[in-house]
Each structure stands twice: as C-alpha cells, then as structure tokens.
Amino acid sequence: FPELRHYNITIHMQGPIPSAYVDKPLKLGVITDMHLGRLITAGRLARSMELLAPEKPDAIFYVGDIIDDHIKLDADATAAALALTQPPLGHWAVPGNHEYISGSIDKSMDFLRRVGMQVLRDQWVMVDDSFVLAGRDDLGKPGFTGTQRASLTDILADLPAQYRHLPLVVLDHQPAALDEAREAGTALMLSGHTHYGQLWPFNFVTELKYENPMGLLTKGNFHSIVSAGTGTWGPPLRTTSRAQVLLVTVHFVAEDKAPADNTPEEKAP
C-alpha cells in the first residue's frame, strides 16, 4: 500500500497573496498512476483517501493513469472511496497515456466524471479566486489520435489579464515539458508517469530520460513535483520506490521576497 509523502514549497506572488491563504497554506493532495482495473481495485484508492483525510487537503489532483483498463472497474466502489475525503476545492483529474491505452479515452474520462472528478483536457479554471489550474492532455495523445495536444500558451490564451498575476498550477502526466511550463510562468507543475522505474534497473532509464524523474525540482519560482505513483503497472511489485500519495503544502509570500532569476537549481527526493 502507498505511503504519504510530504512536500513544502514557497510561491512568490507578483501581486497580493490570495486572501484565503494569507494566514494559512494551501494543501494539495496528489495521486498519480493508480492503474485501476483488473489488478488494482478501488480498495487502493480508499487507502489513499484514508492517508489524505487527516491532512484535510483543500483539493486533490489525479495526474493521469488513474485507469489502466475497464475490466473490473467498479464505479460505485470508486465513488465511495473518493467520498472518504471531501476537499472543499474538489477532485480534479487529467488523462495519462493509459487512459488512451485502455481502449477509449472518452469512456475513461466519462468514468472519472461519473465517480466525482472534474476533468481538464487542455483547459484552465480559476480555483477559489486564488490560483489558476491548467490541466493538460497527455503528451502521448498524437500516437493515439493523430492530433497534437494544445500548447500551454494556447491553453492560457483566453486567460483574462486580471488573473495573470495569480499562481499557475499545471497538471501534466508526463514530466517532459518542464521548460515549456517554466516559460509560461508556471509556479507548480505536478506529474507522474515515471514510476521511478518501478523495478531495478529501470530507475536508471528514468534518470537519463527525465530532468526530474521523481521528487521536487526547484528553479527560481518554478517547482516541478513528480510522483513515483500510487499503484503499479504490470506486476504488483516495486523495488525502486514505495508507492506514494503526495501532500503538497504551498506557502505564499509577497513579491518583495521573491528569489533572484539566478537562484540555483534545487532538487529533493
């Protein structure tokens, strides 16, 4: 079963600190790579909710590969598991490559909506008048549909000017487009996909392929957090990392305390 892993980050505001978070941090639960289906049941999701519930997260994000296949998927059990934690800002999800591999991306997204998640596919929403949440379609979309996903610039093209000072949180299943996210002004990018290799020696492959294969990477005011995943793919076995549920605690500070552009890169497991 997964363990709860904590991350603390500081976001430096270009304008006023969101009023809801002047005296308290924003708490975000993060679940990725659950791979629900024939091998992993809603029981693992229920256990994940039980880990998060005492922390009282403001929102929970499901960053792709929540569904592995549609065999033995139980909507009632999945909805009941979600209900064990009721974040005031909701449950939000984006697709991963396995929502496509499962056979029908539309069927997968309909299932997530039916059990109580709000789905974002190359869309943004304003959350609590405090931050902008952008959910990206999976990077592997062209291989399944023949069409490209939207660029982050295009996704945010209709974001009103009065919201552009607010922190931008991006959900992107594969942690490949870090430079694009940073250039778009992203404060926090949440990803999964890598499983940190899941089995030795594949962790070395993820180290070579991704700038951030697992953990927290900070560059100035940009933070990338990659989860090793809450479930498993294929054999229910891990040798390179524990299955994990994340709690990301976000502290907002005023602009006059912002880091310089040349702030050195920081990496945490």
Language-model features, listed with the residues they occupy:
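Soluble catalytic domains of enzymes that build or remodel membrane lipids, polysaccharides, and related
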Residues: 5-259, 269
